[in-house]
Amino acid sequence: MKTDFKFSNLLGTVYCQGNLLFSPDGTHLFSPVGNRVTVFNLVDNKSYTLPFSHRKNIARIGLTPQGNLLLSIDEDGQAILTNVPRRVVLYHFSFKAPVTALSFSPSGRHFIVGLGRKIEVWHVPSTPDANADGELEFAPFVKHHTHVQHFDDVRHIEWSHDSRFFLTSSKDLTARIWSVDQEEGFTPTVLSGHRQGVVGAWFSKDQETIYTVSKDGAVFDWQYVAKPGQDEDMVDDDDLAWRIVNKHYFMQNSATVRCAAFHPESNLLVAGFSNGIFGLYEMPDFNMIHTLSISQNEIDFVTINKSGEWLAFGASKLGQLLVWEWQSESYILKQQGHFDSMNSLVYSPDGQRIVTVADDGKIKVWDTESGFCIVTFTEHTSGITACEFSKKGNVLFTSSLDGSIRAWDLIRYRNFRTFTAPERLSFSCMAVDPSGEIVAAGSVDSFDIHIWSVQTGQLLDRLSGHEGPVSSLAFAPNGGLLVSGSWDRTARIWSIFNRTQTSEPLQLNSDVLDIAFRPDSLQIAISTLDGNLSFWSVSEAEQQAGLDGRRDVSGGRKIGDRRTAANVAGTKAFNTIRYSTDGSCLLAGGNSKYICLYSVTTMVLLKKYTVSVNLSIQGTQEFLNSKLLTEAGPQGLLDEQGEASDFEDRIDRSLPGSKRGDPSARRKNPEVRVNGVAFSPNGSAFCAASTEGLLIYSLDTTIQFDPFDLNMEITPTSTLAVLEKEKDYLKALVMAFRLNEAGLIQRVFQAIPYTDIPLVVEQFPNVYVARLLRYVAAQTEQSPHVEFCLLWIKALVDKHGAWLSANRGKVDVELRVVARAVSKMRDEIRKLADENVYMVDYLLGQASAAKETNTTKTLALEWATTGSDEQPGAGGMSLNDVMQQDEGNASEDEWIGLV
């Protein structure tokens, strides 16, 4: 089994804090998610997360006008410059202070950062697509200017259209006008008059007017004019100044303005308020277009795309991200992450969906291809502890602390069955047999295991034997046995389908945390509180092997820990374990920043995956800095809310002594942990439910350069020469797979004529068949050439069917991917056909009617040319009768072709 899994995507969290950005074409949205950046494709409905990560949560992001360079800055001022198309980190830089504002110039030559009350102008590194000479010129950032005239933090920066001037808005109640370079006759100007901090300032399209918005809901229009009442003929240049010509107010009662954005081309002003309402206004007349409530908490950021059609909103307290099309008044994107930490997850049998459950009582179904949440269930009234799919994947089962087990229909998206115990219990674990007819659950209140029938919903049995709370349950994949683990330091194997209930106890040295069945049902893995992993034979009920994973899983030190990271007791156990699809590896995670992958055959650690390096989360650093230790305790644990300048930021809405449940807990150093892991059914990826969100690690090599069987003669140039000049399609395809460049493979693949596909596949080497099969399956899901891809699949199955059957264990993953792609295509075609049945019937009916009309007109033309009113072949029908049969749709001149 391959172990080179790489981080590929982050789900479960769509927005944390900071600003949002639209791409220059307006089709992509960049959102800061913790210490990473997620890109949402709003046209194709897909998302991906850039592979880099910061050491702290991201505070500001900026994008060049060309859309090729992304600058992201964390809370400490550490910046990363990234090439967006290549997804490669280019440069690391430190601004040595927290950055409060960031903006790139429209020309792409400069960018400005706000460092508290200081403003710095920097040169943007040149790239081949931005430099006029087309040369690669890359150097560290070069500072152009520094301005220090504000008296409080700068909150917003806006450029003029010609990139010569820029506006800054600050908490010191003023906005200021600056020039990038020294301009003749220009001096920096202060725009003062607001009673609270200025949220933003913008130029109009003609740059004759400046609009400023303050926190108290005031909108001022500024113009470069003389004093009111002064004679225009007597006005000198010294008399002209930026003055307020109009004042407007939002009138949102006690709500304050948290964010605002302006679109100069359409004169649209949008403002987000602290009560979750946003308003859209047309300037300069301040005509309200509409207002809408989109959140229960304050809106933290709003931005407008280049065309002015879409508005993007971010609300950090609930983790909401929305894109609103104001003209049609509809949502383009509406996503929200879990309010609390995720407890469990499960892959659907086809691998296309991932279900996550959390302490907020919500169940979310995520699409693995798009990365979006497609449905959310909210019927549970307390935290959800476990989730399982039925074998076919149409039914989902969840257990909750509210004392219920619920069954969900994922076709109609409804709860069709609820299972409860005679007494009120808090269920902590659950298992479903492969047939989907039996559900078992254990609780922390009772030491019994409850068994229900899915068809009737009745409680069938209660299994007694454990002397402590049941912590884990698992059915054998073949459906014959049930294994349970408890805090009484035993695991039991139950034969629940026999006439007599028997259980085989397995004695362990510590409390059982989790149990996993191997896919062949011959072995179980048990994780205990002492950090050990034990492997037991199901048939003989004997331990086959064991692993001490305390040193592997331990790592990371919390702010208040007095012991080193290696000696912290809370991180020395695996809370969740899962077998790989082929049963050769075991994936384990716990209350630490590591996920461990073990080999079951050799009992060695194969690889450790670091969940997060975010220092905003406790438990991610190995050593603590003694300089951060004060007399009152570690600085990270001190409450600094009382020192905030804004009143609403000084309010502490959390209960005294509470450690969870506060909406702002994401900013109060939560602890890193992995509550659930799962392998995808095809074994090409695994996911982990962590504090950062739903992390997906995959073997996808579409972005990475991974050559296979390479030599000096194989280059992209030689491959294209073989393809275009020699027309040797087989050789060109093999060379492309050796280089393993996605663009080259696609070019060669699409250049092969469909008539030559059987000949190329017949001579294709067996060593590349699995790679070609996986590539064709991926093309089937993405490419519009449906028949072309199906011809490739048919040829591969026909020509290499014997080899695929003999090596089924090696290509099992590829065959599953192909089956999934073909099944998805079939469903899409069936859906398209079902939706257009009546349209096809109508078109066929129109064709038949047109054919009958043409036949009638032909007969009439023959009669007209012969001059007879009645013909033998017409069945005694006269010309007048034929004309009346046409119901007057055409005149006689049209019949005989005169018109």
UniProtKB/Swiss-Prot annotation:
Gene3D superfamilies: YVTN repeat-like/Quinoprotein amine dehydrogenase (2.130.10.10)
Residue windows of the WD repeats: 9-52, 53-92, 94-132, 149-188, 193-232, 252-291, 294-334, 337-376, 379-418, 422-464, 465-504, 507-546, 569-608, 669-709
Top-rank taxon, per record: Eukaryota
GO CC entries: cytoplasm; Pwp2p-containing subcomplex of 90S preribosome; small-subunit processome
Compositionally biased region (Basic and acidic residues): 647-668
InterPro entries associated with the record: G-protein_beta_WD-40_rep, PWP2, SSU_processome_Utp12, WD40/YVTN_repeat-like_dom_sf, WD40_repeat_CS, WD40_repeat_dom_sf, WD40_rpt
SMART domains in UniProt: WD40 (SM00320)
Keyword Repeat: yes
Database matches in CDD domains: WD40
PANTHER family membership: PERIODIC TRYPTOPHAN PROTEIN 2 HOMOLOG, WD40 REPEAT PROTEIN
Protein name, as recorded: Periodic tryptophan protein 2 homolog
Organism in which the protein naturally occurs: Neurospora crassa (strain ATCC 24698 / 74-OR23-1A / CBS 708.71 / DSM 1257 / FGSC 987)
Phylogenetic placement of the source organism: Eukaryota, Fungi, Dikarya, Ascomycota, Pezizomycotina
